[in-house]
Amino acid sequence: MKTLKYVAYILVFVATCLLFSYIFISVVDEEVISKIEDNLGDNIGDFLSGTVGIVLAFVSTIFLFLTFNAQQKQSKEAKDDAFRTRFEGTFFNMLSMYYNVRSEGDKQICQFSKSGSKNMSEFYVRFKDYYLETIGSNNDFAMAMNALDENDILETKYKTALHDLGKLYDEYVKEQGCNAGFYFRYVHNLISFVIKHWEGKKDDIHTYLNFIQSEMSDEELGLLFYNSISNMGQDKNHQYRFKQYLDDNSFLENISEQTLLSRAHYKLFPKTNFSFLNDDERKIVKK
């Protein structure tokens, strides 16, 4: 479009130069005009006006096209603004409801947790204790977890560690007698809403997911991490869709390494560029 605009301006300039050149020569040098008239006959005026007319007509067509294109662009921008406004109205309403959902989750854990956890943060701290106890008492589980420390972990060992850790979370929740499953479902739906609404627009997805992430404590992010790899993180088709959403969009990138049960667990989310990774570790993050 910029090229067409430049062409139009150049043609206007050329037509103007032709017109003023003829006027200037007519006034300054009658002999030159006489020679031109001898060559072109009596039609020099028609020739010049016809040439200028064609140029200006072409220029007018270009400007009409540019005007139409500008109107289309303005119309698209207006639609995009309306689209974003509608989305943000729904999104921020859902985000405000999230606080109520989290509060209800804390109440449920406080009421039913057998370890006496008063909220989700304490529920996660108890899970860390449960993990350490299992590491110390179950050699097979300890071996599976230690495999994650290997630089080039085999696929079979990776899958075993992922399965065993997810199973451990399931066992912990069962032992506690509560999970606040509605909290995880709500977070899942909120994240899914953003991803599906802005499909293919990574920057927009990242912007709005950051709004959600910023409202969560480290312990909540930790619960999302391990809940997503457990049986409770599967969808109706037994697929780990929630984990995929979290990993593909680096939702957990700002979780601290101290929050994870083990630093090596970052390998369970191979596409996430965690903030605590060193330069060598960042090089192997899958895109």
Residue ranges of model-derived segments:
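Extended alpha-helical segments
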Residues: 39-108
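Intrinsically disordered, low-complexity polar regions and short flexible loop motifs
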Residues: 2-3, 79-287
